[in-house]
Amino acid sequence: MEINGVEIEDTFAEAFEAKMARVLITAASHKWAMIAVKEATGFGTSVIMCPAEAGIDCGYVPPEETPDGRPGVTIMIGHNDEDELKEQLLDRIGQCVMTAPTASAFDAMPEAEKEDEDRVGYKLSFFGDGYQEEDELDGRKVWKIPVVEGEFIVEDSFGITTGVAGGNFYIMAESQPAGLQAAEAAVDAIKGVEGAYAPFPGGIVASASKVGSKQYDFLPASTNDAYCPTVEDNELPEGVKCVYEIVINGLNEEAVKEAMRVGIEAACQQPGVVKISAGNFGGKLGQYEIHLHDLF
């Protein structure tokens, strides 16, 4: 299969079940919502060494669609362990959103997806030291926590669902600039898919990994040498000088598949892309096999 002359390898991405939360962060302006978002999604690329996998889902939610009538941004936070995810929700909303000027936090999990919930707002309300108040806003139970700025408003409970983590594809290009241009185009396309996010820096992985190590038994992961252009015995097609990986997490398999589809299509429209592939473990580890050819 080819798209715009770019080979699409007959392979699949192996993805996993993961617990997901979805948070709407609003503020007095989109600028301040984004500042809170960047803090709340920080150090959230991969659970290989990060405490969660976090990123932006919807980069702009207009005031008419938010509970408090202010501009907002929707983020997603994922972890393979539900208790760890609940802890991350508490930590990230408490330390990164409550501390951000004018920011508020609301549950953004669709009711149809919600499997469980955690009373993050209730837990955070104790920061108010007895001065906190329970209230209702736009039909939602919220807590008003007094802070030196005024009040921090946070929804009482946040929904949790079983989503999908680790959807992926590789962009193999004839040069680093060409690869980066294609990867940026892919991420821009993925931003338009609701319920999916790319947790790595700018949505792009520059140092794709493999499980374990050939040389060091203490490593949980090491460089994917088969795709490293500077390694002499790599497995790259002729002419490939750079590889970027795009990793996608989502609320469900459909969102991840759609994000992969539009991302691959966008990448293939850019010059200098040689091949699109994907990472898997032979179907031995993940619950999902997303075959590239089936996306089109």
Swiss-Prot record:
Keyword Acyltransferase listed: yes
Activity regulation: Requires high salt concentrations for activity and thermostability; 1.5-1.8 M KH(2)PO(4) stimulates activity while stabilizing the enzyme.
Keyword Acyltransferase: yes
Gene3D superfamilies, sorted: 3.30.70.520
pH dependence text: Optimum pH is 6.5.
Molecular function terms from GO: formylmethanofuran-tetrahydromethanopterin N-formyltransferase activity
Enzyme Commission number: 2.3.1.101
Domain of life of the source: Archaea
Keywords: Acyltransferase, Cytoplasm, Methanogenesis, One-carbon metabolism, Transferase
InterPro entries named among the record's database cross-references: ForMFR_H4MPT_ForTrfase (IPR014053), ForMFR_H4MPT_ForTrfase_C (IPR002770), ForMFR_H4MPT_ForTrfase_fd-like (IPR023447), ForMFR_H4MPT_ForTrfase_N (IPR022667)
Pathway(s) per entry: One-carbon metabolism; methanogenesis from CO(2); 5,10-methenyl-5,6,7,8-tetrahydromethanopterin from CO(2): step 2/3
GO CC aspect terms: cytoplasm
An individual GO BP term: one-carbon metabolic process
Function: Catalyzes the reversible transfer of a formyl group from formylmethanofuran (formyl-MFR) to tetrahydromethanopterin (H(4)MPT) to produce 5-formyl tetrahydromethanopterin (5-formyl-H(4)MPT) and methanofuran (MFR). Acts via a ternary-complex mechanism. Uses N-furfurylformamide much less efficiently, does not use N-methylformamide or formamide. Protein overexpressed in E.coli has very similar properties to enzyme purified from M.kandleri.
Family: Belongs to the FTR family.
Oligomeric form and interacting partners: Homotetramer composed of two dimers. Dimerization is sufficient for enzyme activity, but tetramerization is required for high thermostability.
Protein name: Formylmethanofuran--tetrahydromethanopterin formyltransferase
Gene giving rise to this polypeptide: ftr
